[in-house]
Amino acid sequence: MQVIIAGAGRVGYNIAKHLMINNSVTVIDQNEFAIQNIQENLDVLGICGNIENPHTYFGIDPQVDLFIAVTDSDEVNLLSSLIIDNIATVKRKIIRLKNSFFASDLIKSKLNISETIVPSFEAAQPFKYLVDFSHAHNAKAFEHTKALLVSIRLKDDFTPRMISTFIGEISGEVSVGGIERNKKFFVPKPSETILPNDLIYFFAFPNAIVSLRSVVCEINEPLSPIKSCVIFGADSLGVEIAKVLVKKGIEVQIMDKNIELCRKANIELKDKVTVFKTTYDADHIVNKNRFDTDMFIAATKNDEYNITKCIEAKQKGIKKIVGINNDIAYSSLMRNLNIEVVRGEKINAYYSILERIESSSIISQKKFCGGEGAVVLRKVFYNSPLIGTKLSLPDKVDDRGHFIILRNNDIFEYQSISTFEKDDVIVAFTKESDFEIISKWLHQNP
């Protein structure tokens, strides 16, 4: 593909790094250092110039398969989308935005934008489920099914047993899509034994997620629902998380040292949330019992700070603690410290864009476990040529993942179903390194 990326910051750099294999990638930015860094480290073309100036685009290929705008400015991203249409023929455009107003279908249609990403909004959505399933570390929802992918840490005294045996003890439909053990991620088969302290990625319907609690969590964990939450960080993500929690009936407080952020948060939340500036650090607030809360979220843009505050809150006995992860390099560390990790805005922008690029009209997919795992879905629609047939599963594919079929809110192992029926959903769990093989297999008989 011919790919143009407007913006050479952290998000643009990581997208270019991922796409440079088997694609022709050009990155545009007026920051000379950023362009130099990209040219020295990546096999892409860097253009140093003003993204808002049409002359910057002269000389690029007139046929562009994918245009991605990921600067920190909505206005720049939208303007670049207009400019590129006058310079080249563009098949697909993905634009990163901060203000959800610009993500409306009307604006997308007028500017010929294929898809928009609003990272602060998308990054806040897992909290809809983390309140209901407080024993889960993270949760992802999917098209075509009500099943969720939730990560749960097994308790210290968990009795090792095979996955197939364990699933038989759960009330409801559940499958295991991945395991992180001793800092390594892998996709298990049902014959794999699960061990204490494993971080398990369960694919399950809501009733099964509830029943998992008594089996996998510490005995002394309180069963009372989450009623209150403190969010440390009043920028856009903290505000979006607060909106989600308020809709769930949670009493929310937001803290920040920045008085201007507090003022803006208070205006946007319309007094539905207590927002206050504090000159104290979070450790002082926790140690002095300045608040009593069921849930603590460290939502600043500094991962080291978030990690520190999560550890302090954990020592104070707060039952649910979540740290926002802004830098991919800290993702594994946070999970290994048993911090419940939710993607921050920049990481969310990166993964959301990759997920959209690698999805199609046939399959959809999402990354998990810090990008080490991928779950790929294909629905069998009423007019699908797959109805009454079945994709053969060769060993070279089967060895690279775990495959299930969703049918009428039931989960079946792939090999147990003889033929596909209308509305079946084929689900494949795999390592990110094997995604291309699984994707190619699922694209058969479109």
What are the roles of these predicted feature ranges?
Residues M1-P446:
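Cytosolic regulatory regions of ion transport systems
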